Amino acid sequence: MSGESLPWISGDLEIEKSVMDEIEQHALEGYPSESCGFVFGPADQPALLDALQREANEADKYHRLDPVTFPRTSNTYFKINELRAARTFEQGQNDGRPVKVIYHSHCDAGAYFSDEDSATFANEGQLMWPCAYIVVSVMNGEVAERRLWVHEPGTNGFRESTLTIREP
């Protein structure tokens, strides 16, 4: 999977203000749990993010079922249903409106890409899902910051990239 065939995975994206506002609202509504979801855009405008789909954070469900394997709760971890994610990516590609970003929030922590995030979304230098990542920080019930993260090819690391808010 390369940035040439899927340019949004390389970053430098532009998000419509209404979409960023909705991501932030989702983060505030979910607090003190992490929120998560997908952001889409037209395939023929690779940098544009113009729609989102909220997803349920299933971290607490997994933690209740198997706290040894899933020791973290939704306050510090998010888990999207993998089958639903695969179907969403496939449908987006088929519709010409691919998933370009997975977003999630951090509660009372910065908008960094955590070691857990890196381990979840990259393995042996390969990106697990063909997208970039937005992390929104909610501190004491208020949005503090937001950052876009992209995979460093050939590593399990991620770097910050430019995310521009597109005013109406």
Name these PLM-found stretches.
Residues M1-V99, D108-P168:
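Conserved beta-strand-loop surface patch within small alpha/beta domains used
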Residues S105:
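Residue-level "edge-of-site" marker
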